[in-house]
Amino acid sequence: MYTQGAFVIALNESQQILLVKRKDVPLWDLPGGRVDPGESAEEAAVREVLEETGYNAALSAKIGVYQRPKFQDEQHLFFGSITGGQAVADGIETAGLKWVSLERLPLFMVPNRKRQINDFKNGAQDVNVTVKDRGLLAAIDLLKRRLGKR
């Protein structure tokens, strides 16, 4: 059975994207996380944004579903906006928050996030993508799964 995740691309008025720094690995990521049993991907995305950032979010479009068969992982990616709340920069899962230009994404990001963000920039809507993980970041992800940190 595939693990389900839900993540949100949220832009501010300056067209900057909201990123969170993870506590489990020193990488930047989109706000999001695991879909709980009985919860829709949309509900999980909104909940995870609040838990990780302190912000309330409203979803406006589904960018797509990204499947990683090697890891039995399926990630739902949404576009949304921040509708309220107060930033929480240091939470249970999050070591920091920042708004960055879509053209100047950090070097150290969770595997495949830049690809997902580029799909968004190129106008992708409701796509289905099968991703093949490569390199060191994929190895980190596999190690985390084996250690039960996901």
Walk through the language-model features, giving the residues of each:
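Conserved N-terminal beta-strand and adjoining loop/helix that marks the start
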Residues: 1-17
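Conserved hydrophobic "DFG−1" position in protein kinase catalytic cores
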Residues: 10-11, 19, 80, 99
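Conserved Nudix-box catalytic region and its N-terminal flanking loop in Nudix hydrolases
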Residues: 12-51
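Residues at secondary-structure transition points
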Residues: 36-40, 94, 108
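Active-site-adjacent beta-strand/loop module that shapes the phosphate/pyrophosphate-binding cleft
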Residues: 67-92, 98, 102, 113-124
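Charged phosphate-binding loop/patch that engages nucleotide di/tri-phosphates or the phosphate backbone
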Residues: 118-150
